[in-house]
């Protein structure tokens, strides 16, 4: 009787374990319209023995409810839609499910079931997915107001180079001087007109000035004057409240003379600087050469003096021996004389 009760109790316990799925549950929060990955890993994965499936809803007693995806241990063999995929390496047990382009219907509970051979050995994992709206942050807008600058129109910009060309030819020859002065006087009388209707008259007069200037003979002096005039155009432009009034010939000549004098002063200063540098270099070279010669002579004199001293030192002991021999001879001679006197 006791054995029957024991067997009945074991059967009921096994049936209860079979009916109650032992599955863990995680919660994943995602955002609508963005991909979401539901984690699932199995460390003891075997390519030949294990397989797995993903389903919608909690894990049942066997297989997966509303199966979304299934693998055979190495690769995906079936899937419900292309939005469900496994980005990990299936052969190493990385079977996390990735859902792309999520919507509200994708929220809920998902089951990851890893099938292991044997009774009650399947690994079950429930993952709850909660989808929310992505928070949108407004970018700060910066408004920049355009700055308006007043534009002042001048009515006589084209007469300036023509009048300057007539004055530049003055120092070349004597006959064209009369033409240039007359043309300049007429230009001065017509410059103050600032109405738009006077453009035609001014342009015709400007063309007349250019034709008169073309009749003048071209030479090297005229070309040089043209080069200087291009730098003086900025000086001749009208400034102040009366933009139409041109400067007089005396002002032009004074400006040209000041420019030429300033250029000549700059050239002279540059030439003086160059000459001073050259003279300094020449003097330094000469001084260095003289010092080298003096050092060479001193070295030679020192060698001669040392040689003479050495010779004198070598000759001194010979002189002493000679002097000793002479003194001995003199002493012997005196002894002989004393002996003769004694005899």
UniProtKB/Swiss-Prot annotation:
Residues 239-258, 313-343 are annotated as: Disordered. Residues 23-279 are extracellular. Pfam families: V-set. One of its GO terms (biological process) is apoptotic cell clearance. Residues 248-258 have a biased composition (Low complexity). Disruption phenotype: Deletion mice maintained on methionine and choline-deficient diet exhibit significantly more obvious inflammation and severe lipid accumulation. Its main location: membrane. The chain crosses the membrane at residues 280-300. Keywords: Disulfide bond, Glycoprotein, Immunoglobulin domain, Membrane, Phosphoprotein, Signal, Transmembrane, Transmembrane helix. Induction: Down-regulated in lymphotoxin deficient mice. Belongs to the T-cell and airway phenotype regulator (Tapr) locus, a single chromosomal region that confers reduced T-helper type 2 responsiveness and protects against airway hyperactivity (AHR), the hallmark of human asthma. Low expression of Timd4 is associated with lymphotoxin deficiency. This is T-cell immunoglobulin and mucin domain-containing protein 4. It comes from Mus musculus.
């Amino acid at each position: 009787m006791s054995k029957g009760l024991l067997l009945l109790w074991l059967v009921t316990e096994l049936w209860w374990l079979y009916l109650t799925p032992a599955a863990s549950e995680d919660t994943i929060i995602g955002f609508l319209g963005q991909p979401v990955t539901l984690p699932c890993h199995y460390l003891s994965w075997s390519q030949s023995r294990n397989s797995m499936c993903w389903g919608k809803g909690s894990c049942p007693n066997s297989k997966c409810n509303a199966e979304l995806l299934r693998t055979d241990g190495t690769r995906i063999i079936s899937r419900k839609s292309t939005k469900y995929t496994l980005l990990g390496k299936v052969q190493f047990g990385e079977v996390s499910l990735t859902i792309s382009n999520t919507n509200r219907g994708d929220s809920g509970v998902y089951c990851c079931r890893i099938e292991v051979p044997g009774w009650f050995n399947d690994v079950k994992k429930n993952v709850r997915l909660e989808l929310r709206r992505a928070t949108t942050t407004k970018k700060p807008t910066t408004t920049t107001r355009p700055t308006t600058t007043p534009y002042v129109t001048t009515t006589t910009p084209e007469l300036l180079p023509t009048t300057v060309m007539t004055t530049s030819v003055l120092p070349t020859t004597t006959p064209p001087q009369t033409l240039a002065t007359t043309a300049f006087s007429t230009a001065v009388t017509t410059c103050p007109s600032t109405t738009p209707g006077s453009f035609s008259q001014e342009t015709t007069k400007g063309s007349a000035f250019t034709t008169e200037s073309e009749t003048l003979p071209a030479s090297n002096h005229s070309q040089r004057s043209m080069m200087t005039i291009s730098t003086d155009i900025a000086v001749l432009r009208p400034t102040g409240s009366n933009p139409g009034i041109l400067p007089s010939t005396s002002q032009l000549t004074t400006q040209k003379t000041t420019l030429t004098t300033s250029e000549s002063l700059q050239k002279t200063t540059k030439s003086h600087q160059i000459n001073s540098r050259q003279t300094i270099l020449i003097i330094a070279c000469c001084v260095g050469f003289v010092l080298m010669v003096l050092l060479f002579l001193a070295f030679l004199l020192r060698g001669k003096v040392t040689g003479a001293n050495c010779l004198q030192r070598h000759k001194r002991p010979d002189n002493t021996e000679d002097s000793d021999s002479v003194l001995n001879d003199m002493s012997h001679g005196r002894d002989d004389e004393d002996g003769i006197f004694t005899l």
